[in-house]
Amino acid sequence: MKLVHVNEPRLEFFNGTHVCPRRGISAYGVYDRNSQTRRTNILLGAVGTNKDLEEFSNLLDRMSHPIHGASEDHKSNLFPDFCGFNSKAGFHSELVFNEDLGRKLRQLDIEKVVRIKDRVRRIDEAINLYYEEVKFLAQNRPVDVVVCVLPKAIFDAVSKDASAEGEEKLEESIEVRSEFNFRRALKAKAMHLGKPLQLLRTESLTSGGKGQQDDATKAWNLATALYYKAGATNPWRLEKNGGSSLSCALGIAFYRSRDKKTLNTSLAQVFDELGNGLILRGTLSPFS
């Protein structure tokens, strides 16, 4: 066996290049900083309990300032400081959220979902609970991204099998979990609304939770996702090499029909050199 080290590709930012997306944004700013079409104020809608919406607002306030990464010196390269999400550094944009952009979930409605014994129906009702609020925001508020905050009760309800279902075979259990994946199903149902979704667990909103990533890493992950999902934004791009032609990356999805009788293949996404993606749908093809 021969091992080959492949160098990290260099990424272009506003006024410099770097191999690390986070350090590149901090040092040189997002690639599209001078673009006339990018969002400088990203309007965020949010769906969650009253407490979760307050915690989400507090999180955005903390993210508007720099956040120190892991304290250990030997981990500084892995966990860099967060530059802050504001108009003066890094992303050169602001995340905007207020009470008018929030939709509160009633505890009574959450409890109704949690009490449903059938797992498939429980997930369907949880999807409907969030979908109706997402639809309101998409149709009545000028939001760029909608954040869905999942309290522990909802997360457990959609991610854990009931004890009565624990006797099924492992293969069948995997298929059920895959087919009725809450995250994918909610995003698929809301796709026609034209607003990207970002799902967060309640535990991600608070600082220093047990077993969680450090605060700077969480901020980097959320900030980058929100900036990219806001549309017409490109935090970085691959450095151009004059000696090689541009290429794109293809993602191919395989999935079975609900009756498990047919296998469908779809060209899922095509990305250009800027990272912009097009979603394509393939047609049914015979297979043996």
Q: Which residues make up each language-model segment?
A:
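Long, low-complexity, intrinsically disordered terminal regions
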Residues: 1-288
